[in-house]
Amino acid sequence: MWIRPVSDRPNEELSPLERCYADAIEPAVLDVVELGLLEHRPHLHQRENWLIDPTRRWRRLGTLLAERAVLDRFVSPEAELWAGDSNSSHGISDRVTLEQAELSGESLRFICVLRAYLAVQLVNDSWKSRIAFEYGGVEYNLAVTDPTYNAPRDGLTRARVELGRTYLTVSLGEPFHGFCYKLVAAIVEAP
């Protein structure tokens, strides 16, 4: 079961203190985490939302190996990443209408692509990344929110890097001007 931990704040974002272990370290991608949950807080466009218990510290139980045999067990069945794609001014198949998101039933997918292209650039004094890939016969170019991949690689200030077999956690974001944007929340490069 996939969950999206949320807070009781109006935007439901987690504070740095709420999303770290007792030693103040934030979880890494592939960490297996135990956390306190108070109640299911679904939205029609994000049904995986669960309210965390802010009084309980998160605990790392272990880390999954970044190996195909392990990761493939968690891959979502191959299908398009939500029906009714449309393109924004910066992306390809990177958004769906709020109505389509509400009909989808899920807002988190863990997928595997054979090849992806990561583009990193400095925009208004902050690093922004997008990732382009093909999945289920559809081309995508999505914004990346994984902090590990929102920084320059190899000292370049603007880079386009080809990634081989890659696992992506794709999420539908909050509604914005009638659309929910598809975001890549985590990237795992397979060995």
Give names to the regions the model predicted.
Residues 26-31, 36-114, 127-191:
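OB-fold/S1-family single-stranded nucleic acid-binding modules
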Residues 24-27, 119-124:
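Exposed beta-sheet edge/beta-hairpin loop segments within beta-rich domains
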Residues 1-31, 35:
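N-terminal ordered "arm"
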